[in-house]
């Protein structure tokens, strides 16, 4: 039974993490909080200024590489914060539930950082050749064009459920190009 609770905790955290990522991204990384401006400054003011939806979506110089990932201490802090609701539930259900949630939270954060790195610094890695990465890269590219849309990087479930999902641009723009970057321009209208 313990392995079942591990799997339930893991699956529940994957879904929860999509909404946690969305909430953090929308309300903390894109809005200055009067008592804690660091996340907004690091993300909206530094990351989004360095990486736009045009050719600058990809690293232009080595100094920009440090503007891709979050600071090292963000990972443990976010993983622990995300696991807090699961800790209370685990006290009543099973500690295996929390262990599964913790494993998923670690995997989700690691996946976030790795995919985000590959999106902004492409090097024809194996993951970059996958169809899932192709779709997620277009999703994230549109976020850099429309910062009020597409808050998820790993699993756009929350974007879908909370009506912030955008699959194509509404207007033409000079978007980033590359082997693993989809065309997110508006579809051409047919005259038929």
Regions found by a protein language model. Give the residues of each.
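A membrane-cytosol interface segment of integral membrane proteins
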Residues: 183-192
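Hydrophobic alpha-helical transmembrane segments
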Residues: 6-11, 98-102
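Short, strongly hydrophobic alpha-helical membrane anchors
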Residues: 1-4
């Amino acid at each position: 039974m313990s392995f079942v609770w591990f799997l339930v905790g893991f699956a529940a955290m994957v879904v929860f993490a999509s909404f946690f990522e969305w909430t953090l991204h929308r309300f903390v990384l894109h809005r200055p909080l009067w008592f804690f401006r660091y996340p907004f400054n690091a993300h909206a003011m530094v990351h989004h200024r360095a990486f736009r939806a045009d050719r600058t979506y990809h690293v232009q110089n080595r100094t920009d590489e440090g503007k891709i990932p979050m600071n090292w201490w963000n990972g443990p802090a976010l993983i622990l914060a995300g696991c807090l609701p699961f800790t209370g539930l685990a006290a009543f259900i099973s500690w295996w539930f929390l262990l599964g949630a913790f494993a998923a939270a670690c995997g989700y954060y690691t996946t976030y950082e790795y995919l985000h790195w590959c999106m902004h610094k492409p090097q024809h890695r194996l993951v970059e050749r996958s169809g899932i990465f192709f779709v997620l890269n277009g999703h994230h590219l549109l976020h850099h064009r429309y910062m009020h849309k597409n808050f998820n990087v790993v699993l756009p479930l929350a974007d879908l459920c909370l009506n912030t999902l955008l699959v194509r641009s509404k207007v033409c723009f000079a978007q980033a190009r590359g082997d693993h970057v989809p065309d997110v321009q508006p579809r051409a209208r047919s005259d038929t």
